[in-house]
C-alpha cells in the first residue's frame, strides 16, 4: 500500500489538537515511513503576503490579478519554521520533488520569488511545518481507525474553501463524515 498523493482524513474520534478534523496530503510514503502536509489548518493572521514581507521578497513585476492574501497552513508539528510549498507543475525550482503528474512540493526560496508574478505556478498552497510517520507507524494508525484514506483531489487541495476540506475529502469515498460516530470499532 502506497499512499503517496492521497489524503489522510482524520476520523471524528481523533482528538489530537493538531490533527483533529485534519486533511493531510501525503507527499511521500515508502518502507521507511511517510511525510505529509496538513492542508486545512490555517495559521492565524498569516497570509502568503506576510511570508513574503518577512523574507523581504517583493514580487516583480507584480501581477495584481494574483491574490497573495491566501492563508498559510500549519503543515504539521515538525519544523514549523520551514516552508513547504505544494503547487502544480512546473518543477523548475532548486528544491522540488514531483509527487504526482499534477503536484510538486518545493522547499527553496525561488518558488516564493515567483508568487504574485506571471511565473507563479497556477495553484499554490504554502505551509509551515510538516507531519511525519516512522516505519509502520502510519499503517498502525490506519489499523487503529485514526484515519480514512482517499486519492488526492486537486480541487480539494487547492480550490475548496479551507473549512470545507475535511468534509469534502471524506465525500471522495462516499462518506458524510459529519454523521459518523466518534468511535469506530473493528468488524
UniProtKB/Swiss-Prot annotation:
One Pfam family here: DUF179
Protein's UniProt name: UPF0301 protein YqgE
Family: Belongs to the UPF0301 (AlgH) family.
Taxonomy, superkingdom: Bacteria
Listed InterPro entries: AlgH-like
Lineage, uppermost ranks: Bacteria, Pseudomonadati, Pseudomonadota, Gammaproteobacteria, Enterobacterales
A cellular component term, taken from the record's GO annotations: cytosol
